[in-house]
Amino acid sequence: CFFSLNVKNNKKKKYKVNKEIGFLAHIKKNIFILGLKGELRIQNVKTKKIIKSILIEQDIKLNRINDGKTDPKGNLWFGTMDNLERKIEKGSLYKLDKNLNLTKVDKNYRITNGPAFINENNFYHTDSSKKIIYKIKINKKDKIISKKIFKKFSKKDGSPDGMTLDKNKNIWVAHFHGACVSVFNKNAKLIHKINLPAQNITNCAFGGQNNNELFITSATKGMNRADLKKFKYSGSLFSVKSNIRGIQQKKFNLKDAKKRSLL
């Protein structure tokens, strides 16, 4: 399942799906694209009508889709991972364009998270299991021309998880098993840290009326009683007001969808 939250009246709504969900991206009105286990699904979440299903990695039984984001043109980028979180490099990074063409851009990941786009050709992407944030450059044909380690986390930092960018192109990174969100500038220098009363921080995104409110998700996965006592708000959604605005996330671009009888 997944939830929506109206920040004006604090109303929460639950939506049920029949598979484990990694991410969702908005297309229009009640129509979203969902990243599910083994499947990308375009669905009207209000009526529950499934409009289109795209099967992903059916030949790798224990893999699932994890995180996903849109780029500045509205293309969808998402990654896969081993569902048992074994230290095997079966995860890949994919791009889905407005015509629903699927391209495998990168491979040999354990746990994919992100990406976060600086511009059309440059983005950050994470392998959480390896504790590495990469900085990747691609050409117009989506071929990687540069892939460098941007930041390597230490054991005490936890693992880099989901991330987002602000208007100044600083990267905000959730720390799984690290109880914080860190902000790094383009030179990987730590410029700010938000400590949180939850151990496993999973993702962060800017929203709110002025796009200056950071929404932060967390999880209780793998925590014992002592951990839950120490971090009693684990599993909660947090919001933090900032004096910096985030980059507006693009909707998934399916502008030819009407002609193709998709929407």
Question: What residue ranges belong to the model's regions?
Answer:
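A short loop-to-beta-strand structural motif that recurs across blades of beta-propeller domains
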Residues: 1-3, 39-41, 91-94, 132-134, ...
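Beta-rich, blade/repeat-based domains predominating
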Residues: 18-32, 59-75, 105-123, 153-170, ...
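Conserved beta-strand positions in repeat-built beta-propeller and related beta-rich domains
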Residues: 33-38, 76-87, 125-130, 171-176, ...
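Loop/turn-rich, solvent-exposed surfaces of beta-rich toroidal or solenoidal domains
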Residues: 131-132, 147, 151-189
